[in-house]
Structure formats: C-alpha cells, structure tokens
C-alpha cells in the first residue's frame, strides 16, 4: 500500500483503524524484514500465485476504498485510486479467475456505479437514500451483477463475493423503499461468519435499523461503541447520531454528531455532519 500503491501512512492507518504512528512502525518493521531476509522483488512463479492472492485482493480492496470514500481532503471520492483499483482488478481476473477475484471486481464496479450520484453539483455529500438513481451507471451495475452471479455459482463463496451480493441488492433496487433489507441483513450474517470485523458489524447494525427500526439498530451500534474497537471511527458515531436523531433523542444525537465531527477528516463529510448538528441546535 505504501511503496507500490503510493498511499500515505495516514490513509493506510485509517483503513486499518490504527493510529498513524503505530502504522508507521509497522511499515518500518516490514522494510527491515524484507531487507534482513533478502526477500527479492520479483514476479512469483505460477505455482505461488494462489497463496499470495489474498494479500493482493486486500491491497486492491483498500486502494479502492480510499478512492471510493477519501479519508481526508476536499473531495468525497478519488477517481484516480478507484479507477486504478478496477483496472488492476480486471487484470487479476484475467490472470487468475478465482471466485474471490471475480467477487472483488464485481464489488468495485457496483460501488463505482453510484459515483456521480454520491455528490451534489457543488461537491456536497449525498447519502444513499437521497441519491438520484437515474444517475447510477447501469452498464457497471449490469456487469457487476453478472460477475456476482458468476462468483456465487462457483460454490466457493468468500467475503468479497458476499459484499458484492450486498452491493447488488442496493444497486438493483428501484428506490430506497423497495430495497430488500431482510436479504441484506442475511448476507451480513453470512459475511460475519466468513470475515468478522467491527466495521462489518456496524454495517449490519445500520441494515437492521432499516429493517426493524432505528431503536433496534441503535442498540447494536451503542453496544459496538461500548466495546471500544470503533471509539475513534467517525462513521460509528455518525451512525449513532443519525439513529438517535430519528428516535428524537436530540441530546444523544448532538453528542454523537460532535464526536463524529471531531474525528472526520474529509471536508464534505465534515460539512454534512456540521449541517446535521446545526439542525439539532
């Protein structure tokens, strides 16, 4: 991520939910290991590709994520990163058509299909439920959906394929109201078995809120925050704030919005959170 893809230490730290100094030390140790073990910089032999695939997929995924939602700066997205991740993802599928490589390409295309609708003409953040779906890229949705089916048909289902299936449910819903939230929660349940993480739990909690109401989702989000793993993750506090707001718990919502605003580093997100906070006041 640092030396090949050019992400900054701060961007990588954000991706791993780690402090930047901690991440910097990991990079120093990794460089020392490469140097001391005389690990060569060369293309792996064909028989070595499969065992290295997971790491390659992870790198492509994290580069795409930084392009899809920039961790800092003046723009919601970075098309240079997401475009490069999709390009490399296509090459990987051609080289090694593994179900998870196919699933990752599907996920990226389905997420990228919403790019134009995710910001207003003046660059402000537009949430999923408020997006103009006529702006979504139907060609990317069709290609991504076909790749999801291809990956799932292999019967070797992994976390990227499941995330792509979730994205396909969103992408193929005609409206926010017609979204099949029960299916999305069920897919998150599968994803939690395959690749459990606090961020996946948070996403599932938001889906539960959409299916069962904000009180059900808020209980899950607050439980996650109490565990401490997402204490410095601004989107967890933003989710808590939104659900509390929808329940009329204005004081709790205000505190959570203030915490999210203090942690957010992307300017459009900060402006969005600031507007929500001002509405409460």
At which residue positions do the language-model features occur?
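Amphipathic helix-loop-helix modules that constitute alpha-helical solenoid scaffolds
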Residues: 3, 8-11, 18-189
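"A position-specific structural signal for the A-helix of alpha-solenoid helical repeats
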Residues: 104, 108-111, 163, 167, ...
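Generic helix N-cap/helix-start motif at coil->alpha-helix transitions
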Residues: 195-201, 231-236
């Amino acid at each position: 991520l640092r030396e090949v893809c050019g992400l900054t230490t701060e961007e990588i730290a954000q991706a791993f939910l780690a402090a930047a100094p901690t991440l910097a030390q990991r990079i120093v140790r990794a460089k020392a290991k490469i140097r001391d073990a005389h690990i060569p910089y060369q293309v792996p032999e064909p028989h070595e590709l499969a065992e290295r695939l997971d790491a390659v997929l992870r790198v492509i995924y994290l580069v795409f994520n930084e392009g899809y939602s920039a961790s800092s700066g003046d723009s919601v997205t970075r098309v240079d990163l997401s475009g490069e991740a999709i390009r490399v993802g296509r090459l990987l599928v051609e080289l090694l058509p593994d179900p998870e490589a196919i699933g990752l390409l599907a996920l990226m295309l389905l997420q990228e299909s919403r790019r134009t609708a995710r910001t207003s003409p003046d660059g402000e953040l537009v949430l999923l439920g408020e997006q103009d779906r006529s702006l979504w890229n139907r060609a990317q949705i069709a290609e991504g959906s076909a790749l999801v089916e291809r990956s799932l048909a292999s019967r070797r289902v992994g976390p990227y394929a499941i995330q792509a299936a979730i994205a396909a449910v969103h992408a193929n819903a005609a409206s926010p109201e017609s979204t099949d939230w029960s299916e999305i929660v069920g897919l998150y349940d599968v994803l939690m078995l395959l690749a459990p993480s606090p961020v996946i739990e948070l996403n599932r909690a938001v889906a539960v809120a959409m299916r069962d109401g904000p009180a059900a989702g808020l209980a899950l989000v607050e439980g996650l925050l109490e565990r401490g793993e997402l204490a410095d993750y601004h989107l967890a506090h933003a989710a808590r704030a939104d659900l509390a707001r929808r329940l009329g718990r204005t004081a709790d919502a205000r505190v959570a919005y203030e915490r999210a605003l203090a942690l957010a580093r992307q300017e459009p997100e900060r402006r969005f959170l600031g507007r929500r906070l001002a509405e409460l006041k």
